Amino acid sequence: MSQPIIREIEEGDFEKGFLNTLDTLREASTISKDKALEIFNNIKSNPNHIIIVAEIDDRIIGATTLLIEPKFIHKGGFVGHIEDVVVSKEFQGQKIGEKIIKYVLKLAEKHNCYKTILDCSDDVKQFYEKMGFKYHSNEFRFDHN
């Protein structure tokens, strides 16, 4: 197997299966191409919203999002928020998730984030602990729908 290329998303990644890869988390591939491009352009216009993909042989097989939040506290520092970490089922267990997380943590550090946080389900807690994350607090969620 080829080694994955980890990089920022490009418009052409929709043709390489980006939305199908997101289906591993939640249904994404059913949105229209126009809607996908609208979302893509909105994200690309915000330098604090970065989508990272993993590509093997012209196919997107993993992804995550890094949101960089400017803060008034911590002397105007930044917090990195990791969202939507995904690896296609057939590529899980091959350390691709680790490569994606290492890449995005370096990116957060490059953007001067003083910490990077994420929420996860219990079934992947050990993965993040192995990556150096520490349990810190509880998450509360309010669903608007």
How would you label these PLM feature ranges?
Residues 3-18:
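A short beta-loop-alpha structural element at the N-terminal edge
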Residues 19-31:
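Helix-loop element at the rim of GNAT/NAT acetyltransferase active sites that forms part
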Residues 41-53, 81:
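A short helix-loop-beta-strand connector motif used in the catalytic cores of GNAT acetyltransferases and
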Residues 53, 59-68, 86:
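Conserved beta-strand in the GNAT
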Residues 70-82, 92, 136:
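A conserved beta-turn-beta hairpin within the catalytic core of GNAT-like acetyltransferases
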Residues 87, 93-106:
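Conserved acetyl-CoA-binding loop-helix of GNAT-fold acetyltransferases
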Residues 101, 108-120:
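Conserved GNAT acetyl-CoA-binding A-motif
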Residues 117-126, 141-145:
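Conserved beta-strand-loop-alpha-helix junction that forms the acyl-donor binding cleft
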